[in-house]
């Protein structure tokens, strides 16, 4: 019954392997980034995030987070360079967060957890569509951005203001004209490694690009994330208090760092 996965005691990350055996695979995400063990690689380039023409469409509560969806029918918002070969189109972004401000990020840095983590999901245009790309080892590229508790984030507030209208699973709301680059800091220094989606189906098709510099979020803004529901309307209320997967074994992988 694969559609019953979640983040609870009986269906959470430690149970996923039963329906999705790849959960114990060789390139699972997230991981802890040990800054003393990362490898500088002169072949890495600066990231090119070309989001000027980005066309956000709508916001959807999918029962495990909420997605802000983009028009990916053309090269409107793309990611290039960095560790990547080719062009990757932005299809959606979403967040992972915790039940308190001291946890919630999926990646950790020297075991340190942040309050939340933004994932900007892109697919390799050489594969024609997201579904096909998600099955390929170089099919997806996800940019991870840590949210660190501090000042309120005005760009993020535009997103949070819509959450009341998508409180329960299956609800969606129009969300045009949002610029995803407003959520990013200017400095795009990063760590990168080969990994996976961090929730089922956990496909091992992701080149991870984790930005070193966190963006800010206030404690008050964090409360808004936790006001969403995992459940659909009319079902018993289950607050979306936490939706993060813990760090997975690095196994035979290297985390590379830019700049060196």
From Swiss-Prot:
The modification N-acetylserine is found at residue 2. The keyword Amino-acid biosynthesis does not apply. Disulfide bonds: none annotated. Catalyzes the reversible hydration of carbon dioxide. Can also hydrate cyanamide to urea. Involved in the regulation of fluid secretion into the anterior chamber of the eye. Essential for bone resorption and osteoclast differentiation. Contributes to intracellular pH regulation in the duodenal upper villous epithelium during proton-coupled peptide absorption. Stimulates the chloride-bicarbonate exchange activity of SLC26A6. Interacts with SLC4A4 and SLC26A6. Interaction with SLC4A7 regulates SLC4A7 transporter activity. PANTHER family: CARBONIC ANHYDRASE (PTHR18952), CARBONIC ANHYDRASE 2 (PTHR18952:SF120). Belongs to the alpha-carbonic anhydrase family. This is Carbonic anhydrase 2. The lineage of its organism: Eukaryota, Metazoa, Chordata, Craniata, Vertebrata.
